[in-house]
């Protein structure tokens, strides 16, 4: 009963922040913002320190938004250490700075490490910004510096595919 009450309070708080939170957060402080999760179902296992969310999962941290079918949050000492997103295609979007074009991406699996500001996209991954794109089976995106690394040297995964379009003449 106690866990259900905690879950209900968390869901109500999450919904409030999801609806009104985008007006409260500054882009440069995404990492300092809480991670807000909204889903159809939620369970927490205190013994394994895992929280599982399923069904139209939406997670938001500042200007970062991830949509997925399932999210598993791994906790360590009461803090979210790793978030694993899975689904038909897990999708993310971030506004890196005021006035900059959004960075978007998708993959079948995503891993987010909040303390390291690192998002890893695995299996059929693509990241876009403006008209440019990176595609690979493995992409790392440093959220703080907007640095994208694609491909794995130690595997036989597909090659990296990059599209760089010229700016339109004015």
Model-derived regions, located:
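Mature-chain termini and adjacent capping regions
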Residues: 1-170
């Amino acid at each position: 009963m106690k866990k259900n009450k905690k879950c209900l309070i968390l869901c109500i708080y999450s919904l409030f922040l999801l609806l009104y939170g985008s007006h409260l957060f500054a882009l440069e402080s995404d990492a300092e913002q809480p991670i807000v999760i909204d889903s159809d179902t939620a369970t927490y296992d205190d013994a394994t320190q895992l929280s599982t969310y399923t069904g139209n999962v939406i997670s938001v941290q500042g200007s970062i938004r991830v949509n997925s079918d399932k999210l598993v949050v791994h906790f360590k000492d009461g803090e979210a250490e790793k978030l694993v997103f899975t689904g038909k295609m897990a999708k993310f979007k971030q506004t890196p700075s005021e006035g900059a074009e959004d960075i978007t991406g998708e993959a079948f699996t995503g891993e987010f490490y909040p303390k390291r500001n690192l998002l890893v996209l695995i299996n059929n991954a693509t990241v876009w910004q403006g008209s440019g794109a990176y595609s690979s089976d493995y992409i790392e995106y440093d959220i703080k510096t907007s640095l994208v690394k694609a491909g794995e040297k130690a595997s036989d995964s597909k090659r990296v595919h990059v599209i760089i379009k010229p700016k339109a003449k004015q």
